[in-house]
């Protein structure tokens, strides 16, 4: 699902997890050596800000906080160059992310704070109709809430995200494990 927000143009896309190319987090588990960590212009760690943006919404819906998974973040970061090459949002193949879900976002380079990026997914809650997935959207189209339902999915315990920046765009890729948005399961 691709949608736009009203500020500049931001595009969000649905269910998986995120790898973060940002400031090293100081988390107890060191990221794998192949993870490229860049100094972030976002101030505090990108990891902490993305995690907080997810966990605020989860708390409001009675879901346990997500834990950061550096391996999911590395996997997310590795997909950023592919998005940059095609210049649009397209989910990675499920074969490349077994057992994981993925949320994607795209916006003008440097125009959005991490909270606004995740906020585009969280804004989908306005269409949420609690029920059994996929019958959970007041619009009748589950894709209109799929990013948000993945953010708050109670069975998901870990997330890892990355921001990939090219000359024109920032891409946020988040990967989630275990994946959510499972048909026949209750939301929230």
Language-model features: locations:
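Bacterial N-terminal signal peptides that target proteins for export
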Residues: 2-14
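Boundary at the C-terminal end of the N-terminal hydrophobic targeting segment
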Residues: 26-29, 35
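Bacterial N-terminal signal peptides
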Residues: 12-22
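Cytochrome P450 catalytic domain signature, combining two hallmark sequence patches
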Residues: 83-95, 127-133
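A short alpha-helix/helix-coil micro-patch that ends at or immediately precedes a cysteine
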Residues: 34-88
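A well-ordered secondary-structure block
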Residues: 98-188
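Short, glycine-/polar-rich solvent-exposed loops and beta-turns at beta-strand/coil boundaries
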Residues: 69, 95-97
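Histidine-centered active-site/metal-ligand motif
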Residues: 54, 90-93, 147
């Amino acid at each position: 699902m691709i949608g736009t927000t009203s500020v500049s143009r931001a595009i969000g896309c649905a269910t998986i997890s995120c790898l973060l190319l940002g400031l090293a987090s100081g988390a107890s588990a060191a990221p794998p050596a192949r993870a490229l960590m860049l100094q972030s212009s976002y101030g505090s760690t990108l990891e902490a800000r993305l995690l907080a943006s997810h966990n605020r919404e989860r708390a409001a819906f009675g879901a346990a906080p997500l834990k950061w998974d550096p391996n999911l973040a590395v996997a997310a970061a590795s997909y950023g160059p592919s998005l940059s090459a095609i210049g649009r949002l397209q989910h990675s193949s499920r074969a490349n992310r077994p057992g994981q879900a993925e949320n994607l976002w795209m916006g003008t380079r440097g125009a959005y704070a991490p909270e606004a990026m995740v906020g585009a997914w969280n804004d989908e809650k306005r269409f949420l109709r609690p029920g059994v997935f996929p019958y959970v959207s007041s619009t009748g189209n589950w894709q209109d809430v799929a990013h948000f339902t993945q953010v708050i999915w109670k069975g998901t315990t870990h997330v890892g995200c990355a921001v990939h920046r090219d000359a024109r765009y920032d891409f946020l890729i988040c990967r989630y494990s275990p994946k959510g948005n499972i048909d026949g399961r209750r939301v929230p």
